[in-house]
């Protein structure tokens, strides 16, 4: 069975998912999980799992469990994997994991100074 291609685009500063197929309305948005929205990401869904709903505006209802992720790119803005220094004193090597968040960023001395509070 052929699948319908969905694409995530930025419209007026907001991420919208649209069906990228000439047989469907190109101006209609799709109901879509926000956690999957990334500009340029593509998805696929079976035609039976999408339905057009027209009220004040038209949109496609997409069954959330029927979505297949085709391409999604996640940008890493910052990573400190190569940095081994404590983020507080910036001189001692990090050795402690903060609780409850799990950040591995502190040396032993700074961890005790802040009382285990990240």
Curated annotation (Swiss-Prot):
Q: Which InterPro entries match?
A: Znf_RING/FYVE/PHD (IPR013083)
Q: Which Gene3D superfamilies match?
A: Zinc/RING finger domain, C3HC4 (zinc finger)
Alphabetical UniProt keywords: Apoptosis
**Record's protein name:** Putative apoptosis inhibitor 4
Q: What is the lineage of its organism?
A: Viruses, Viruses incertae sedis, Naldaviricetes, Lefavirales, Baculoviridae
The gene behind this protein is: IAP4
């Amino acid at each position: 069975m052929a699948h319908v291609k969905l694409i995530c685009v930025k419209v007026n500063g907001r991420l919208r998912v649209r069906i990228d197929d000439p047989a469907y309305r190109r101006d209609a948005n799709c109901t879509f999980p926000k956690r999957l929205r990334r500009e340029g990401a593509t998805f696929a869904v079976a035609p039976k799992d999408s339905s057009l709903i027209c009220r004040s505006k038209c949109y496609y209802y997409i069954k959330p469990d029927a979505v297949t992720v085709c391409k999604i790119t996640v940008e890493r803005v910052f990573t400190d994997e190569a940095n081994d220094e404590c983020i507080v004193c910036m001189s001692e090597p990090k050795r402690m994991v903060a609780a409850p968040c799990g950040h591995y960023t502190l040396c032993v001395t700074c961890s005790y100074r802040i009382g285990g509070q990240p």
